[in-house]
Amino acid sequence: MSMKFMAALAFLALQLIVMAAGEDQSAQIMLDSDTKQYHRSSRNLRKRVHHARHDVAIVFNVEHYGAVGDGKHDSTDAFEKTWNAACNKLSAVFLVPANKKFVVNNLVFYGPCQPHFSFKVDGTIAAYPDPAKWKNSKIWMHFARLTDFNLMGTGVIDGQGNRWWSDQCKTINGRTVCNDKGRPTAIKIDFSKSVTVKELTLTNSPEFHLVFGECDGVKIQGIKIKAPRDSPNTDGIDIFASKRFEIEKCTIGTGDDCVAVGTGSSNITIKDLTCGPGHGMSIGSLGKGNSRSEVSFVHLDGAKFIDTQNGLRIKTWQGGSGLASHITYENVEMINAENPILINQFYCTSAAACKNQRSAVKIQDVTFKNIHGTSATTAAIQLMCSDSVPCSNIKLSNVFLKLTSGKVATCVNKNANGYYTNPLNPSCKSLHPGRTPKELELHQKPTTLLMDEKMGASLNSSPPNCKNKCKGCQPCKPKLIIVHPNQPEDYYPQRWVCSCHNKIYNP
């Protein structure tokens, strides 16, 4: 092969390399200041954000794509360009730098994108305060079809909703009536999997702040959501048709629900929630417009409700159908909260009374455990269930609520069936007393009735042979114990074990 040919080939290869580099120059040639800023602002999040194959993060700073962080100029196009450049890169970081304020109109951030994609807000993203300048969209920032996506940062996402509220709300006969037409949600995430939202502050959305639709596997940690007490429909976190959510250590104060779980949702876990002001935590509303709704396996463990309009609320419309079940609230403190415990199957937004209908969403298997504090309303517990589809298996355990004034609160119960274990204050007369949640030894014949734990079927079961089953402890004897002692009187799942000196061993 001639030297001239070799030289020409080398020159062609060099040209291709230069062309490829030029196509993605803004992404690959990173300024030292951007990289330093990203790592500096990520120190507190470093343990929380990691990449499965230890890929090197590529930072896409919105300023490099034309964004101007002076709080005046429109940076919408620059944000779109940044997203388009970052979406196709593995371990990309879309960076909104600190100490800058970027004004943007509505944005669409659609995937699919490469894995380990982070949208990092360390500065402020602000919406246009004037509704007249808003594009015709019900969503300000819409994320969709993403997998392994992080929305995080120490910055602020400000919906600047004041003008929306003042322009669309009027007081009629002492009642505030708002026109929700056109008022946008701040952030909506749809059709996405393995999503994390961390540390951000969301404030003053014209309507809902953070909404999820048809998502699977979402973690929300340490975010703050703020809006005035009288801001209309400014829900904090709304979840629809989604599953496997973990919400932890969030502080939310708005003009509506702090957290709302809507139809089609299941396996929702919430821990260490601080709510107030707002309308508390809601399941629903469900069954609107005679629709069918399903919600199951919602667990709130650890919460504080401060000066809220409601505490723990399940709300359904008359005429609907479906099921809301396996809902547990525990370890909750109420501080001057109105309606601390509320099941309302007569939910209605009309100024006039809604017509009583025969069908309703069924509510069953709901537990309120370790709930204490003060109520701003006389009825601290309200179990208002459907006439035709009563609530079943409602359980109250260690509930102690009194009025903020120190006076005795009351319980209002309509068509709610279930039981309680002491203490229960205020008392709910129609609920039945249940057994205390401790292991109960039953002295029965060698052959006894055993309730199958999963199916509830009756079985004949003989005591096991416990010889050599207690790891050297003597005497080792059969013992019948309650598996779930908090179940109602008519259902006591039991099983045989081997016991020695109050220690339990599997037979």
UniProtKB/Swiss-Prot annotation:
Gene3D superfamilies named among the record's database cross-references: Single-stranded right-handed beta-helix, Pectin lyase-like
**Protein name listed in UniProt:** Polygalacturonase
Q: What UniProt keywords apply to this chain's record, in alphabetical order?
A: Allergen, Cell wall, Cell wall biogenesis/degradation, Fruit ripening, Glycoprotein, Glycosidase, Hydrolase, Repeat, Secreted, Signal, Zymogen
> Which terms does the UniProt entry file under GO BP?
carbohydrate metabolic process; cell wall organization; fruit ripening
List the subcellular locations: Secreted; Secreted, Cell wall
Q: Please list which residues make up the signal peptide.
A: 1-20
Matching entries from SUPFAM superfamilies are given as: Pectin lyase-like
According to the UniProt entry, its GO molecular function terms are: polygalacturonase activity
Name a single GO cellular component. Answer: extracellular region
Q: Which residues form the active site?
A: 256, 279
Entry's family note: Belongs to the glycosyl hydrolase 28 family.
PANTHER family per record: PTHR31375
Q: Kindly list every residue the record annotates as glycosylated.
A: 267
- Primary place of residence? secreted
Q: Which InterPro entries match?
A: Glyco_hydro_28 (IPR000743), PbH1 (IPR006626), Pectin_lyas_fold (IPR012334), Pectin_lyase_fold/virulence (IPR011050)
Report the domain of life of the source organism: Eukaryota
Cite the EC number: 3.2.1.15
Provide an example Pfam family for this protein: EPF
Q: State the PbH1 repeat positions.
A: 215-241, 242-263, 265-285, 295-316, 324-345, 358-385
Q: Which reaction does it catalyse?
A: (1,4-alpha-D-galacturonosyl)n+m + H2O = (1,4-alpha-D-galacturonosyl)n + (1,4-alpha-D-galacturonosyl)m
